[in-house]
Amino acid sequence: MTNEWGEVWYYKYDALGRRIEKACPQRNTKTTYLWDGDQVAYQETEKHGKTESLRHCIFNGWELIAQQDSYFKTDLRNHHKTWTQTTNYAVCQPNGQPLALFNPQGKRTWRKAPSSLWGLPLLENWESKQAEPLNPNLLFAGQYFDQESGLAYNRFRYYDPQSGCYLKSDPIGLAGGETPYAYVHNPMGWIDPFGLARCGNLKKNKMGCLQGIKDYLIGI
C-alpha cells in the first residue's frame, strides 16, 4: 500500500487471514503481531532493526480490558532514554471502541480523540499531544486502525471510517444485502468483528458472532 505521503507499506497475513506483520522501508519500521484466537495478544515494533516498543493486550470477548506497554521514554531534563513498563485498564463504548486508559492508581493516561459516528478522527495531531504513546489503535470491535492509511483492518476486509463503508464488497455479493460495501446500520450498538456479518451487541461472545456468520452465509 502506498499512502498519500509516498510511503510504501507491506502487510503479511497467515492462512486464517490474520495480519501478522506490517513494515515500511522508508521509516525503517516493522511491527509483528501474535494472535490469541481472533484477537491480537502481543505486538512488537522495531525501528532500524532494534526493538522500540512491546505491547500485550487482554480482551474480554471483543472488548479491551487491559494493556501492558514497554517502550523507551525520553527524560526531558537530560534527553536520556529509559525502558519504561506500564499497565493500564480500558473503558470502552458499547461498540468496542476504547474511550480511555487508566493506570492502577486511577489516573487517566490516554483518551480517544473526538471522532465522527463512523469512527473518523476529527482532530489532527491528537496523539502527539498525549503524554504517553499508549494509543490502543482500536476502532470498533475487531478493527485495528492504521495511522499510515486512515483505514481499519477488520480481519477479512478493510473499513474506511471516512465513508463508513468497506473497501471490498461482501464476499457473498448481493446475497448479503443491497449494499455489499456497507458496514453495520448503527455503529453505536452493532458490530462486525470479522467484516463478514453484523452482531447485535458487544456482549455477544465469539461463538455467537461465529454463529451469526454461519446463519448469514446460508441465508437465514
What are the residue ranges of the model-derived segments?
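Beta-turn initiation residues at beta-strand->coil junctions
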Residues: 1-6, 21-27, 42-49, 66-72, ...
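Short, ordered coil/turn segments that flank beta-strands lining enzyme active or ligand-binding pockets
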Residues: 4, 15, 26, 36-37, ...
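Aromatic-rich beta-strand edge motifs centered on tyrosine
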Residues: 9-18, 31-39, 54-63, 88-96, ...
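Hydrophobic "anchor" residues
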Residues: 19, 40-41, 64-65, 98, ...
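Short, low-complexity export/processing leader segments characterized by acidic and small residues
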Residues: 22, 120-124, 157-167, 171, ...
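A motif-centric feature for acidic-aromatic and gly/ser/thr-rich catalytic loops and repeats
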Residues: 78-155, 188-190
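Catalytic toxin/effector domains delivered as secreted proteins or via bacterial secretion systems
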Residues: 199-220
